[in-house]
């Protein structure tokens, strides 16, 4: 565990479950002070840990985000690390069958939500001597993803957003990187596989096997590995890394 994150003030979006909760736990274990938001009620998993607080916020709602950052300022007294983790899977289907409202919702959460949070975080991060933004993208932001066009489009946008921010904010010492997970073990990927199986008329086991077959390591990614990368990027050891799209995907060659 990286140990030089003690005292850092960290905001994790969508921190009540899955990857987000693992990030909350990892930062807290390293001695950081962590506030997380989630679309569910504020008092949730992780708030029993020392130095962890939470509130409700929908990152696609600018009013919610404004209230969130006011609370972060009040609770943490500033910000050193923003982890833009919030995201949704979006619809599964052929492009001609996708409801435009589902397209809009996917992009509103997955990329506009990151903009909403980053826009308010940057003035706070400029006051920090060790500032970092970690954006969650996806393997779908490096490869195409059949029948998941809204999701893939949103994650390609996250990578472009990340690289542009790194250039813009570098002069202020703010590092910006993206993590691109592959198939991460947990309820979300189970739902994705189930939806894909239904859309293709295949079994769940067939879809899962096909996904693993195109990765060299033939495995799902433990969410703790993503949390460890986020902590590293926020630490002194990661202080020379910016503008990168870092894949944690078991060496996936394609998405199926």
Predicted regions span which residues?
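Conserved glycine-rich Rossmann-like NAD(P)H-binding loop of the short-chain dehydrogenase/reductase
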Residues: 30-45
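C-terminal helical subdomain
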Residues: 178, 186, 202-237, 241, ...
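Substrate-binding pocket helix/loop in short-chain dehydrogenase/reductase
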Residues: 93-95, 99-107, 211
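Residue(s) in the substrate-gating loop at a strand-loop-helix junction
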Residues: 138
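Active-site helix of classical SDR
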Residues: 118, 154, 162
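Short C-terminal tail/terminal secondary-structure segment
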Residues: 4, 89-92, 143, 219, ...
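Short, small/polar-rich loop/turn modules that mediate ligand/substrate recognition or access, typified
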Residues: 170, 175, 241-243
